[in-house]
Amino acid sequence: MPRELVNAKITHVSYVDKAANQKQFFIVKSEKQPDFQKEVRILAKEADEQKLVYGIVYEPDTVDAHGDFMTAAEIEKAAHGFLKDARQIDKQHDFQGGVGEVVESYVAPADFEMNGETIKKGSWVLVTKASEEVWEQIKKGEITGYSMAGTAETIEKQEKPVSQEKTDEKGLFNLLKNFFVGKQQQSYEEPVAKAGRKFSASNLQEIKNAHAALGNLLSQVETKEGEEEMTSEEVTKSIQEALEPIKKRLETLEKEEELNKKDKEKEEETEKEGEKLKKAISEAVQPLADRIEAIEKSRGTSKQTEESGSEQVQKSIWSGLF
């Protein structure tokens, strides 16, 4: 993710050699640790008697190798601040002066070319006059560019704006994928219980088929996403088609549940009616049983044992009815 550099304060410009060319331009934080690097090429070298060296310090809105960039306004602030408060030129960041001096420092007012190099509008161009020693190193190719030292604040920037609609669609697909293809997948391999009843094997197979259909939909969407973006209408239609089998099966299950509920209610009603009938018969027969018992008690003792056995048989018969 690119970082925007703001409020940069450049304190030194160094001549650097080829070995340091990979880290020619850098800005450090307040702890004086490097934050990013950018190669700055020397664009032109004037006649020996002048020893003038031209270079681009920074281009606006151009992300460097370390993912940093500056706007034209921030570059202008940094360039003006350096010219006003610093103007320090050293070599290899040794912070020892006397090796060069600032001749020109300006921000390009328009695009132009210099020695075949296109200078972009808003770029910071620096011209320095090198010392005799440094000039000889430049001619030999031992000094190849500038390196800047200073401080800057950073702001994280999103690399590419994403519309809310696309974000919502991607979030929906991820949600479906995680639910139907992720950890939940293993739960389908075991019986699914609901309200104290288990789904039958056929019902479970229907759910598995619907799960497979949704998985196929997700695969198609992911493939199509790599080729072209789907519209909201296409997304809605695809999901509705994939959910249609589940909707139909759910309606069937609800109807079956309703029928089972009605059957259970009928069974409970029948049991209640049976209990009422049993109670009515028991109440109607009980007076007869009482009268028989009274008659048997009034008979003689000689037949008491025999009649008692008969009474027990009769009572057991009555008892068996209820």
Curated annotation (Swiss-Prot):
Keywords in alphabetical order: Coiled coil
Annotated stretches, region: Disordered: 254-322
InterPro entries assigned: XkdF (IPR027924)
Record has Coiled coil as a keyword: yes
Domain of life: Bacteria
Pfam families reported in the protein's UniProt record: Peptidase_S78_2 (PF14550)
Membrane-spanning segments: none
Basic and acidic residues: bias regions: 254-281, 290-299
Biased composition (Polar residues): 310-322
Record keyword Coiled coil present: yes
Coiled coil: 205-286
Family of this protein: To B.subtilis XkdF.
Protein name in the entry: Uncharacterized protein YqbD
